[in-house]
Every structure is written in C-alpha cells, then in structure tokens.
C-alpha cells in the first residue's frame, strides 16, 4: 500500500517525518518497506515566463524564446508548436538532469544559443501527453519550483499490509492507525452534495439473487457530465500512489478507492437497458467481454452484474466493454457494492484478473462506509466533470451489516500479554479503535467491533490490539518460570519427539511423505469418515481442498496414486503431521492431534538379484510398528481385531497396555482400486500424542548381557482359525514361568478343512528359556514347556 504523506495529512495533523511514521507503523504491525519521493527527479524544474517568442531564422519548426526564470532571463530554442509569448512554463536550466537521465547543457541549435529547455508533461514524466509544452496557470510566479507550485513535494511510504488488515488498504485506514499511534484527531472529508432534478431512487431497480454473495448494492445517477481530464492535483496525487490517470470520471473512482478503500464502478447509463440491475451468478460456460477487450469464459460460481438484457460487469473484478464510459457519455450510473470476498477471490485468480478493486473485495470492504464513499465520489464527479447529481439512491440491501460482539476480560489480557494492565488503558484503547463497550465496570466486557475491522473475531484479537497499542517493544523481557524439574533423557518437546520418529523412519529405509493439511470433503466422504467433526475452510483455494484433514489416509493414498502413475512397483512411506477436528469445548473450537501414517504397498524389495519378487503384506506393516515401539522402549503391543473400521478391512487395533495407540490393516479393495492400486494396500495410523505420553513414563533401565546360553523348544498349537496368534503369545507371556524368556511364531500351516468342519491352523512357536546364573538342564526346560502346553490347552481349548 502506497501512502502519500500529503494525502494522509488531510485526515490527521501529523507533523513528524516519514521515517518516524514508518517506524511507528512497523511496531504496530504495518511494516515499512520503503520511503519514496516520487517527484524528486523534477525537483530542480522551475517556473518560467515566456517574455518573447519568435521564429528561428534557420528552421521553421523551431522558436527562439526569451524566458524569465526569476533570477535571470534565458535564451531558449523550443520546438513545441504551442509555445507562445506570455505563457508560464516549466523550465529545466543548464545543469539539470531530466527524469530520463538527459543532462541539460548549453548548446547552439542552427546557430542560435539555447540555455535550457522548456518541458512537456511527458518529458517531466507527469503524464503521457507529448503534443506540446506544459502550460502552467497564469498566476504562477517565475523562479518558483514546479513541485512547490503543483504541490508535488511529497513523500510516499510503501507499507506492507498483512492479509487480515483489509481496513488499512486506504489512506483513511492508515490514518486511523496514525491517529491511534500518535493520539491525533481524525478528520473525515466534508460532504456537500448539491442535488438537482426529480428523485432518481426508482429510476433503476436493483435485484440481488443471493444476499450472501452481495449484501448491498447501490448507485446514484449523475447527468450532464463531460469526459474531460481530471485536474492536475488529482492526476499527480493518483500518480504518486501508482495509479495511472485516465479521465475525470474514472479517476474519481480510483481516487475514492485509494482514499476510502471502497471500489466503485461507473456505467454509461444510456448503455444500460431495461432500467434494471440484477446481481446473480453466471451460467456455466457463459461468455463475457471485459473492459480490456478479452472474452472470458465464466463458471457458475462467478458473480455477474446484468441489466435488463445483458451482462454488464464481472462483479468485483472488472466492468464490461459494452457499458464503459466513453467520450460520448453524458449520464453516469455510479455503482457502489459489497461482494462476498471468497467469490471474488476465486474468480479473480481463475481468470488472472487481479486489480486494485478485486484486491480489496477479496479481503473485505466496509459495508457501513460504502454509502459515504459513494456520495463522496458523486460530489467529486460533479465538481470535476460539470455534472448534476440527481436526488435519491437506487439501493438494495438484503443483508444489513451485523456488528460482531466479543467478550473482553482485562485480567485475561494481562495474563496473555504478561504485563500489568490498567482497565482505563484497555477501555481507552478499544474506544480509539472504534469499538463500543458495555459492562466495562465488570470483569467481563462486551465489545462491539467497528464495521471496518473484519479481523476482530474473538477475544484474543482484542487482546492483540491492546498489546499493539501498548507496544510489543515495551513489554519487559522475562525468563520463563520452570514449573517442573528438568529430567535428563525425557523428550517433553513435541519437536524433539517428532525428530526422533523421523530419524527412525529414515533409518529404517522408509520414504517420508509431506502432504497438504487441506483435503476435500469428497475425499473424507469416500473413506466413510464422519462429517460432524470436520473443520471447513472459509476461503478454500480449490474445491478439492475445502476442509482440514481429520486423518492422514487421504494424503497418503494420493501419494500412492502419484507414485503409481510414475511407474513405481513398491512403496513404503511414512508421514508425521497434524490432524484437525472440531471441538466446541476448546477456546479455538478445534483440536489438533499428532499422527504417524504408514503405507506399505507392492514389491517388498527393489529389483535385482538375489532378492525374490515378493509383495509386502501385513507382517511387514506389523513389524514396522513393533520396531517403532521397541525403539521407544514401550514394549510389546497387542494387535486385536476390529470389525467396524470405515476404510480398513481387516483392521486391528494397536494397544500398548490399556492405551489405544492406533489402527492398522488393509485398505478396502474398492477404495484401493479408486486410487489405481492393483495390489493390497496396507496402512497404519498411530496416535503420536498417546505414544509421547507413554514415553514420559518409561524409565530406561540397564540390563546386563546374558552370560549363559539360551535353550529353545518348539511347540505346535493346533487351534481354530478364529484364535489369533496374539492370544497364544499374550497368554504365555502372562504365565509365571521362572525360566521363560521369549516366544515367537516361526511357522503357520493351514490344512484342508473337511466338509462341514471348523477351519483350523497349526501354529508353531519357538520358546526361549534362560537362567541368568547357570546353564539349564533339559529336564527343567521340558518341564517348563509342558507347563506352557497344559496351560494353553486349559485356557484356550487348543491341542498341542
């Protein structure tokens, strides 16, 4: 945002320097990028009075002039056709460097000495006008600097405006901040409307199809205009803030845009048909030609302005070529509206039509101020173009502005900012921001936000405003208090814990995936995930990214699809990220949880001898999970069958002790097929917050290396297929066995099931026995094995 210091001073009596202003605004969160002096290049140009003007004796197209520049009279040869005696003109004396870089030197032109140059507007880079020299007002005093005469001695600040501060995209918005920072009064421009003729409030009827898309649309009629250039002061002011002057009518709309932040559009009223304006969405595939002469193909989500017969503007983005102001225009319909920011943003980005107007509509404009802005523009149009303003406003407002009401607790503000705050300071600050207060004598206030502050949505926003005005640099630095003992080896930091998990994944040879937090509602619906806990995005970049993910599966499955499209035959990836769920009990109405996603697909090993071409399966996924738990010193986990999962079948629940740490299983075939998978896809999603909590209670103890050798015995359990392996291993580990060390599954055999019989399988386990102080004897090992066999038979009903 370019801010003219002279323009700012029309709103606030600021007397300091540009640098002081920039530094203070920076501390308020409006960062100063650069200080510009836009007319420094013509600072040495002075006013000259042409005393005499005669034809050059050797050239018909040259004139020889004697010019009074205040301190001396110069002989200047000029080639402009419009130079004449008696004129007041801008003069560049010998030694002056022009904006183009040309340095003026004393010269002879066809034998006549020339000690300077009479300048045109284009040579001064004040406009594109190059037909002749620039003629100044007759009351101009010779020798006066041109920048002083035209009030061009200005300083412009380039301020970086954050996306949430749309109210600062105008001189008025920044003037509010300056008034707040320096405790200065704010003065609004004075309105002096001179209306003539009959009431025009019903001359153009306005219909709005959807009030959510267009809360208010209004316009005024101005008759008898002339499409003349705007005066020098307006052209130069617009140029100083980067806006190219065009004509008086168009320049006024741009002037109000920069001054008050309200985009406007001027229609040629005689080109509007049916005395009617309709605001509605376009038809899918509809074509419309904008002011730049380009035909645009529209979507059903684009908002159009129509008259009684045709589309006349792409709402909030650009007007139509069929109703633009031209040299023959005599009547103007001045449009002033407010549109839904998300709609304008989507249209502008899709069509690549970013403009100063769309930039402000995308971020939100002040609905309450819009009427004032329209009347201010109408007043200027009448003054500059000789028009007559008709009484009455053509207006439709289906959705009047509803001010946000927020709670504010001074005690909460003091706690959040870490300083002692006076209630009077908080009250005064909020009132200076334009807020109204009630209940200010109680611990909890009710604050009504002003219409121009769309970013004030919750108590924390008000506290931030109090902190801004107090001065973040005034908050004393204080070391954080240590509220618990520092224990070496504990990974209390989420960052440290996640770094540890990432190092584990990379060390295991897994590839790390990083996906967007945004997914589509349709992605979550396809996986059968509940809709009640979702957090929709108000202004999504695309319809495919309109909600925050509630699980990592959509992103990982899209990663799989992308890799398959690139010819991958096997994939083993992990992702550490947050998921987001709605939680009304939270201050932020959202709950954020850390998750680890694992995906295993296709070929287990890379191509090449001597590895076999095998596909990864459940045992690979389970092994990865078990390895992670061992690395975290969390001990063995129970994998219990779960029948009600939305996108995994079969699915097991991973339990560490009594805590559910996640799920694992095979992605349902129809879901896997939709992501172009032709083999089984195995996935796990693990709750990192639960693991981190469990890790805090783990005390790592040293275990001495065994001195005596182990003794191993195999045992085959013949059990119904419905008995899980974990039932056997958990039972054995839970027995009171003095010599037992470990149990692992080493073989599975599934014999044919006789007709009408119950499916069975033979599970062979390897039992490990060990004594820490001596070598075991076969007899005592066999006795322990027999205890295991007997206990399994009694507890699980299996055969040994």
Swiss-Prot record:
Q: Which gene encodes it?
A: pheT
GO molecular function, a single term: phenylalanine-tRNA ligase activity
Where in the cell does this protein reside? Answer: Cytoplasm
- Cofactor requirements of the protein: Mg(2+)
According to UniProt, the name of this protein is: Phenylalanine--tRNA ligase beta subunit
Stated EC number for the protein is 6.1.1.20
Q: Does the keyword Iron apply?
A: no
The UniProt subunit note reads as follows: Tetramer of two alpha and two beta subunits.
What are the residue boundaries of the FDX-ACB domain, all occurrences included? 706-800
Q: Give the organism the record lists.
A: Oleidesulfovibrio alaskensis (strain ATCC BAA-1058 / DSM 17464 / G20) (Desulfovibrio alaskensis)
Name a single GO biological process. Answer: phenylalanyl-tRNA aminoacylation
PROSITE patterns of this UniProt entry? B5, FDX_ACB, TRBD
Keyword RNA-binding appears in the UniProt entry: yes
Q: How is the cofactor bound?
A: Binds 2 magnesium ions per tetramer.
Q: What family is reported?
A: Belongs to the phenylalanyl-tRNA synthetase beta subunit family. Type 1 subfamily.
Q: What class of enzyme is it?
A: ligase
Q: Which UniProt keywords apply?
A: Aminoacyl-tRNA synthetase, ATP-binding, Cytoplasm, Ligase, Magnesium, Metal-binding, Nucleotide-binding, Protein biosynthesis, RNA-binding, tRNA-binding
- GO CC annotations, alphabetized: phenylalanine-tRNA ligase complex
* Domain tRNA-binding: start-end pairs: 39-147
Residue span, B5 domain: 401-477
UniProt main location, coarse: cytoplasm
Specify which residues bind Mg(2+) according to the UniProt entry for this protein.
455, 461, 464-465
């Amino acid at each position: 945002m370019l801010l003219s210091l002279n323009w700012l001073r029309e709103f606030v009596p600021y007397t300091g320097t540009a640098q002081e202003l920039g530094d203070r605004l920076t501390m308020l969160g409006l960062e100063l990028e650069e200080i510009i002096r836009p007319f420094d290049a013509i600072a040495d140009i002075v006013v000259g009075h042409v005393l005499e003007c005669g034809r050059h004796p050797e050239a018909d197209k040259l004139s020889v002039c004697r010019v009074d520049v205040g301190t001396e009279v110069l002989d200047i040869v000029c080639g402009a056709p419009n130079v004449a005696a008696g004129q007041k003109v801008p003069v560049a004396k010998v030694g002056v460097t022009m904006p183009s870089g040309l340095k003026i030197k004393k010269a002879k032109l066809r034998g006549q000495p020339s000690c300077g140059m009479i300048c045109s507007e284009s040579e001064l880079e004040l406009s594109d006008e190059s037909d002749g020299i620039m003629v100044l007002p007759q009351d101009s005093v010779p020798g006066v600097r041109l920048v002083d005469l035209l009030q061009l001695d200005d300083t412009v600040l380039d301020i970086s405006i954050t996306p949430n501060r749309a109210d600062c995209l105008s001189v008025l918005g920044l003037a509010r901040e300056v008034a707040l920072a320096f405790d200065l009064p704010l003065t609004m421009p004075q309105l002096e409307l001179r209306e003539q003729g009959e009431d025009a409030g019903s001359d153009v009827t306005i219909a709005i199809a959807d009030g959510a898309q267009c809360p208010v649309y209004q316009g005024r009629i101005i008759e008898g205009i002339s499409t003349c250039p705007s005066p020098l002061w307006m052209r130069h002011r617009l140029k100083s803030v980067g806006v190219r002057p065009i004509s008086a009518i168009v320049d006024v709309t741009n002037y109000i845009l920069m001054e008050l932040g309200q985009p406007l559009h001027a229609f040629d009223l005689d080109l509007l048909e049916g005395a009617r304006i309709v605001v509605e969405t376009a038809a899918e595939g509809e074509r419309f030609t904008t002011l730049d002469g380009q035909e645009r193909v529209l979507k059903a989500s684009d908002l159009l302005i129509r008259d009684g017969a045709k589309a006349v503007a792409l709402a909030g983005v650009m007007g139509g070529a069929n109703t633009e102001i031209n040299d023959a225009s005599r009547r103007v319909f001045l449009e002033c509206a407010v549109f839904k920011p998300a709609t304008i943003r989507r249209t502008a980005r899709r069509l690549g039509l970013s403009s100063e107007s769309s930039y402000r509509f995308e971020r939100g404009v002040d609905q309450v101020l819009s009427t004032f802005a329209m009347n201010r523009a109408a007043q200027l149009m009448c003054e500059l173009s000789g028009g007559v303003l008709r009484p009455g406003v053509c207006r439709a407002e289906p959705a009047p502005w509803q001010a946000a009401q927020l709670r504010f607790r001074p005690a909460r503000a003091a706690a959040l900012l870490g300083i002692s705050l006076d209630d009077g300071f908080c009250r005064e600050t909020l009132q200076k921001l334009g807020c109204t207060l009630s209940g200010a004598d109680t611990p909890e206030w009710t604050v009504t936000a002003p219409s121009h502050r769309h970013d004030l949505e919750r108590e924390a926003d008000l506290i931030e405003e109090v902190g801004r005005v107090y001065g973040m640099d005034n908050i004393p630095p204080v070391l954080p208090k240590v509220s618990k003992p520092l224990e070496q080896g504990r990974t209390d930091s989420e960052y440290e814990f996640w770094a540890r998990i990432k190092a584990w994944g990379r060390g295991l040879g897994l590839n790390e995936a990083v996906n967007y937090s945004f997914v589509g509602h349709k992605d979550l619906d396809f996986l059968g995930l509940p809709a009640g806990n979702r957090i929709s995005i108000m202004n999504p970049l695309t319809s495919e990214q309109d909600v925050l993910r509630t699980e990592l599966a959509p992103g990982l499955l899209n990663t799989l699809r992308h890799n398959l499209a690139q010819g991958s035959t096997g994939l083993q990836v992990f992702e550490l990220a947050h998921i987001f769920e709605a939680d009304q009990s939270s201050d932020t109405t959202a709950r954020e949880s850390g998750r680890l996603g694992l995906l295993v697909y296709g070929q287990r090993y890379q191509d090449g001898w001597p590895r076999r071409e095998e596909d990864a399966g459940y045992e690979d996924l389970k092994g990865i999970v078990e390895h992670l738990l061992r690395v975290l010193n969390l001990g063995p986990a129970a994998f219990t069958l779960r029948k009600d999962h939305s996108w995994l079948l079969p699915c097991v629940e991973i339990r560490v002790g009594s805590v559910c740490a996640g799920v694992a299983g095979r992605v349902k075939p129809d879901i896997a097929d939709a992501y172009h998978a032709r083999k089984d896809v195995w996935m796990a999603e693990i709750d990192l917050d639960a693991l981190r909590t469990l890790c805090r209670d783990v005390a790592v103890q040293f275990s001495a290396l065994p001195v005596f050798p182990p003794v191993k015995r195999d045992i085959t359990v013949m059990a119904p297929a419905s008995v899980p392996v974990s039932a056997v291993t958990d039972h054995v580990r839970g027995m009171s066995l003095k010599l037992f060390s470990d149990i692992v599954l080493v073989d599975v055999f599934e014999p044919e099931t006789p007709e009408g019989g119950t499916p069975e399988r033979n599970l062979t386990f390897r039992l490990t026995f060990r004594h820490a102080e001596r070598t075991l004897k076969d007899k005592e090992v066999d006795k322990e094995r027999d205890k295991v066999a007997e206990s399994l038979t009694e507890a699980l009903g299996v055969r040994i």
